[in-house]
Design a protein with these regions (language model features):
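Transmembrane signal-anchor helices characteristic of membrane glycosylation enzymes that use polyprenol
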Residues: 1, 127-136, 244-245, 254-256, ...
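TM-adjacent membrane-interface loops and short helices in multi-pass inner/ER membrane proteins
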Residues: 43, 181-183, 252-331, 345-352
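Short, highly charged, low-complexity non-transmembrane loops/tails of multi-pass membrane proteins
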Residues: 430-444
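Intrinsically disordered, Lys/Arg-rich low-complexity segments
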Residues: 462, 467-482
Length: 484
């Protein structure tokens, strides 16, 4: 974050490479932008999980700590975690921390009757304040645009559709159809013919003599250029729309085909996608989610299998590659834990996961509304609960993978264990019948204890009576003996 990367030093390069590569350390390049925090992970987005969980956990441990040196160490660790999360550039991490902290504070405020009204007032004030900030400040506008996005692809880019037919290629430019075809002249030159939707020929003007690029003499297609090209001895054409090249070749069997970035001739097929999210929502995750949603219907009962999202998600999304994440780049993750779980484990598997998470969260809320927070163990459990909250929220815009999942499930298990310890220690959630039975048992014991002195006194009186009777009998005998 401060421009000091240990892995870019000679020591760091030796640390992360094999001995056989030590003579080529100068050729080792790093793809991370300068000033980006990534620790030992290959993706800075994963830091939103790690430090998103650690920040609330360390804060709770600080509150529960008793010794000064413990608090000092926790403050240093908290500052370092905040710096790393800031350096990762992950907006979703900060949003998850803020949302998790808000829920945790509301849980604490709900412990008292009067504080509940304070919590309700804070919720209302927070909603109103968020709306005002989002619509009146540049900071709020940026946050709002990051979350909701700003555009749909068909509204942002002029090329909306492509059709590879037998006789031509039809490109839809701002709702205007442009037909492009070509023929091979006797001298071997490629002659391009352009028409509008009514079949009217469109004139062409040489725009670049060196590349033989032609512009179209029509205002509707002012951003379109065509170029005759040869692809390994195969004649074809390139159509440039907004500076992006789309290559087509005419074949004898299938007519016109699209030459995709992998160099394969295919019939262009429009990929199904949802319009639920804007393309740039959550740093272009909206487009990925739109492409994932149509796949969900296939996996209501049975998922595709672990780590098979890459095979299920349509990878012939050429518009997305051209305008959003680049050609020959493929989405291997859904960038949403729950959507990916649905694809890979099915709807029922996803509902089971969500149900398990909700069970822990609801039970934790019930516990920490009642438990004694003067105990250190209580703050440990509450910190683990807050950490799980942040992870569950951050997972809406991130993937749970082998880099982050072990830490989460470890904290989740610790949270469950601490919750059980607190329930047992403070006798929480005891049923009314059990309470009544305990009270009755205590009452019976008390009655027995109260009755014990009475019984003892009765026994003592009986004993005294017997002693008196015997003394009377003895005195009579003595009197008779005296008479004799």
């Amino acid at each position: 974050y401060f421009g000091k990367d240990i892995f870019k030093t000679v020591f760091g390069k030796h640390l992360i490479t094999n001995v056989s590569f030590w003579n080529q350390l100068d050729n080792l390049n790093f793809n991370m932008a300068e000033g980006t925090s990534y620790t030992t992970l290959y993706n800075p987005n994963f830091l939103s999980f790690y430090f998103g969980m650690l920040i609330p956990l360390l804060a709770c441990l600080f509150i529960g700590a008793k010794k000064v040196w413990q608090r000092a160490a926790l403050v240093v660790a908290e500052i370092l975690c905040i710096i790393c999360l800031k350096g990762s550039g992950s907006d979703s991490g900060w949003m998850a921390v803020a949302a998790g902290a808000a829920i945790a504070v509301l849980v604490l405020l709900s412990r008292g009757k009067k504080l509940r009204y304070v919590g309700g007032a804070l919720v209302v004030a927070g909603i109103i304040g968020s709306i005002v900030i989002a619509n009146t400040t540049s900071f709020g506008e940026r946050i709002k645009n990051t979350i909701t996005g700003t555009y749909h692809m068909e509204d942002q880019y002029s090329l909306n559709d492509i059709a590879t037919n037998d006789e031509d290629v039809v490109l839809k430019i701002w709702d205007n159809a442009l037909s492009v075809s070509y023929d091979i002249a006797e001298d071997g030159t490629i002659q391009i013919l352009c028409k509008d939707s009514d079949g009217n020929p469109l004139g062409q003007t040489l725009a670049d003599e060196g590349t033989q690029t032609y512009s179209i003499d029509d205002e509707r297609f002012a951003n379109v250029q065509v170029q005759p090209v040869m692809f390994d001895q195969t004649a074809g054409i390139s159509v440039y729309v907004d500076g992006i090249s789309w290559n087509f070749v005419k074949t004898d069997d299938d007519g016109y085909e699209f030459l995709n970035p992998a160099g394969k001739l295919v019939k262009y097929e429009k990929v199904k996608q949802s319009n639920l999210f804007k393309e740039d929502a959550m740093s272009s995750r909206g487009h990925i989610w739109n492409m994932t949603i149509p796949v969900l219907g296939k996996h209501v009962y049975v998922g595709s299998g672990a780590n098979t999202y890459l095979l299920e998600r349509p990878q012939n999304d050429y518009f997305g590659q051209a305008y959003i994440y680049g050609f020959n780049n493929y989405d291997v993750k859904a960038h949403c834990w729950y959507l990916q779980q649905w694809v890979e484990t099915g709807l029922f598997g996803t509902l089971a996961l969500i149900g398990f998470l909700l069970w822990y969260i609801i039970r934790s809320v019930r516990i920490y509304r009642r438990v004694d927070l003067h105990e250190h163990l209580s703050w440990v459990g509450f910190g683990l609960f807050a950490a799980v909250l942040v992870y569950v929220i951050a997972a809406v815009a991130n993937d749970s993978n082998v880099c982050t999942a072990p830490v989460f499930w470890g904290m989740f298990g610790l949270g469950m264990a601490v919750n059980r310890m607190l329930v047992t220690k403070e006798n929480l959630f005891v049923k009314a019948e059990d309470t009544q039975t305990t009270e009755n048992d205590n009452a019976e014991v008390q009655q027995k204890n109260d009755a014990a002195p009475v019984n003892e006194s009765v026994k003592a009186e009986n004993k005294n009576g017997k002693q008196k009777a015997s003394s009377k009998k003895q005195s009579r005998k003595q009197r008779k003996n005296q008479k004799k």
